[in-house]
From Swiss-Prot:
Belongs to the DMRL synthase family. This is Riboflavin synthase. The keyword Transferase applies. GO terms for molecular function: riboflavin synthase activity. It comes from Methanocaldococcus jannaschii (strain ATCC 43067 / DSM 2661 / JAL-1 / JCM 10045 / NBRC 100440). The gene is ribC. The keyword Chloroplast does not apply. GO terms for biological process: riboflavin biosynthetic process.
């Protein structure tokens, strides 16, 4: 069964995370149709994601953004995150938030690596939510992280 996956990214981001996520999704399944939209900034993500769910019939959407280092960027990221949560509640569908804050990395090389890895790992989560949700259940409590190294379970 073919599933529709929406991908929304921003021109503000410094890495093309959408292309990375799309490539990974295509590797994982031939049964995924992808609809990509690009918006200017992170606060534009919620409405674009909601439109993909409601108007384009997407089963799930990835929201890819890269907040800057300034305090106002963190505020904007928080507002965008709240908007994404509201859009999920209004549509009863998942929007996977994939934010990479510029200050998470020590330099541009690490930022590029982190953005690509986080986009790929969240694309895998999208695949599992759509096609193999039981896998996610088996991974509960494992301390999995998207991007940097997994934390692992608190107790073995």
């Amino acid at each position: 069964m073919t599933k529709k996956v929406g991908i929304v990214d921003t021109t503000f981001a410094r890495v093309d995370m959408a292309s990375i996520a799309i490539k990974k999704l295509k590797e994982l399944s031939p049964n995924i149709k992808i609809i990509r939209k690009t918006v200017p900034g992170i606060k534009d993500l919620p409405v674009a994601c909601k439109k993909l769910l409601e108007e384009e019939g997407c089963d799930i959407v990835m929201a890819l953004g890269m907040p800057g280092k300034a305090e106002k960027d963190k505020v904007c990221a928080h507002e965008a995150s709240l908007g994404l949560m509201l859009a999920q509640l209004m549509t009863n569908k998942h929007i996977i938030e994939v934010f990479v804050h510029e200050d998470e990395a020590k330099d541009d090389k690490e930022l590029d690596w982190l953005a690509k890895r986080r986009a790929e790992e969240h694309a895998e989560n999208v695949y599992y939510l759509l096609f193999k949700p039981e896998y996610l259940t088996r991974m509960a409590g494992k301390g999995l992280r998207q991007g940097f190294e997994d934390a692992g379970p608190a107790r073995e």
